[in-house]
Amino acid sequence: EGDVAKGEAAFKRCSACHAIGEGAKNKVGPQLNGIIGRTAGGDPDYNYSNAMKKAGGEGLVWTPQELRDFLSAPKKKIPGNKMALAGISKPEELDNLIAYLIFSASSKPAZ
């Protein structure tokens, strides 16, 4: 189990490209509200890479474990995706970040 407060601090790196929480909008990357249980490439208001759309079309749904695998090595998990992150190598940081995403992703995106 991760620490939500530490995950919020870890998300600061992500916030350059992603928004989460009440009123979140797509930025360089998609907003992350409702990410758990969302099909990869599944936000109709975001222009995903073909690689991400293909992953979703093949059935990839974001679970905590799938997010962990992706965030640890985005280009390995989904070659050709647009995410600039090289990967998060520390298991504790991944735990905290995923705890924060689960906690915060229940918010609704901006209308």
From Swiss-Prot:
Keywords: Electron transport, Heme, Iron, Metal-binding, Transport. The keyword Cytoplasm does not apply. SUPFAM superfamilies: Cytochrome c. Heme c binds at residues 14, 17-18, 83. Cytochrome c2 is found mainly in purple, non-sulfur, photosynthetic bacteria where it functions as the electron donor to the oxidized bacteriochlorophyll in the photophosphorylation pathway. However, it may also have a role in the respiratory chain and is found in some non-photosynthetic bacteria. This is Cytochrome c2. Belongs to the cytochrome c family.
